[in-house]
Amino acid sequence: MARNEAAIKRTLEKQICMRCNARNPQRASECRKCGYSNLRPKSKERRAA
């Protein structure tokens, strides 16, 4: 499967809220849903099921 750079950027370059798990833009400083400021980058590797 070929990896499309635009698709990777759109799906993986996100910030995840540690409180409510909402997806936020890469440059966000606080969550768009709950206002929490502790955001983590979305994992680039798939987790084992």
Swiss-Prot record:
Keywords carried by this UniProt record: Ribonucleoprotein, Ribosomal protein
InterPro entries: Ribosomal_eL40_arc, Ribosomal_eL40_dom, Ribosomal_eL40_sf, Ribosomal_zn-bd
GO BP annotation list: translation
Matches recorded under SUPFAM superfamilies: Zn-binding ribosomal proteins
GO cellular component: ribonucleoprotein complex; ribosome
Keyword Ribonucleoprotein attributed: yes
One function term, GO molecular function aspect: structural constituent of ribosome
Domain of life: Archaea
Family statement drawn from the similarity comment of this UniProt entry: Belongs to the eukaryotic ribosomal protein eL40 family.
Record protein name field: Large ribosomal subunit protein eL40
Organism listed in the record: Haloquadratum walsbyi (strain DSM 16790 / HBSQ001)
Lineage: Archaea, Methanobacteriati, Methanobacteriota, Stenosarchaea group, Halobacteria
